């Protein structure tokens, strides 16, 4: 099973749990939610509106279909283009902490790189941290379904970054070799004052030599916030850039064609900013 076939299985499961009177009614719910998400992402800096709630299964399906496919490809590209990240993921064992990684972009992007690079005999443990517990159901079967020459262990852990009681007890993830932040800071920018202690905790406690891969919308609010956190915690810049990120969708169209016919094309291009940082 390749990666897009895996996403197809995840989408099939997510589609099946949506309650509606008919398939056409279910599809209409999803189409409306895709439009709603697009509108919500245009208002990520509007503090009068709370952070997006992903407890609704329709919203989770809409996100995975519309955004996860593209965002995973961006992660793959950024890893492929940075030697230190490539070497890290070729080690016999690597631990990754995917912060706000419930939608799966971080995990799938790493897997896509490993598969395309032909990596063998390695073991990757991905700690996926997110407030919405239901995301864990989406990725719990990855190790069983993915036929790969390397081993992958997704470990979902629920936390609310604004509530220290939910994350102070977690210690193991702080020894991760790589921390990923894929379109996460923009989701929580509205509550940045409450989120700052969590990010400071992670960046101050991460081990020497570990790295952070940050990618998000190319907006000064989000990028400046990350840069402030990185500077405050003495992280070294390995690479940074603002650029358009895009992906080739031939594989996606073949394996996800049923959903393309129903819901149109997933996101294919983004005006993005990324940072690759290292703990000195």
Question: What kind of region is each of these model predictions?
Answer:
Residues 1-47:
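N-terminal auxiliary segments of SAM/dcSAM-dependent transferases
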């Amino acid at each position: 099973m390749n990666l897009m076939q895996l996403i197809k299985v995840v989408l099939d499961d997510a589609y099946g749990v949506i309650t509606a009177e008919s398939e056409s009614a279910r599809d209409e719910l999803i189409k409306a939610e895709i439009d709603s998400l697009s509108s919500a992402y245009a208002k990520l800096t509007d503090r009068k509106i709370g952070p997006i709630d992903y407890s609704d299964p329709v919203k989770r399906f809409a996100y995975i279909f519309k955004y996860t496919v593209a965002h995973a490809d961006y992660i793959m590209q950024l890893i492929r283009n940075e030697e230190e990240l490539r070497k890290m993921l070729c080690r016999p064992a690597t631990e990754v902490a995917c912060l706000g990684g419930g939608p799966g972009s971080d995990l799938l992007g790493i897997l896509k790189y490993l598969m395309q690079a032909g990596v063998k005999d390695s073991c990757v443990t991905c700690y996926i941290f997110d407030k919405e517990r239901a995301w864990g159901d989406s990725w719990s079967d990855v190790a069983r379904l993915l036929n790969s020459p390397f081993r992958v262990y997704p470990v979902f852990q629920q936390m609310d970054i604004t509530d220290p009681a939910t994350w102070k007890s977690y210690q193991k993830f702080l020894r991760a070799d790589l921390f990923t932040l894929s379109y996460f800071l923009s989701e929580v920018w509205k509550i940045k004052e409450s989120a700052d202690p969590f990010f400071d905790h992670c960046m101050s406690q991460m081990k020497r030599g570990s790295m952070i891969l940050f990618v998000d919308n190319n907006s000064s609010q989000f990028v400046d916030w990350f840069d402030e956190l990185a500077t405050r915690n003495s992280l070294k810049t390995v690479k940074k850039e603002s650029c358009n990120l895009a992906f080739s969708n031939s594989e996606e169209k073949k394996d996800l064609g049923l959903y393309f016919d129903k819901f149109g094309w997933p996101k294919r291009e983004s005006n993005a900013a990324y940072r690759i940082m290292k703990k000195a």
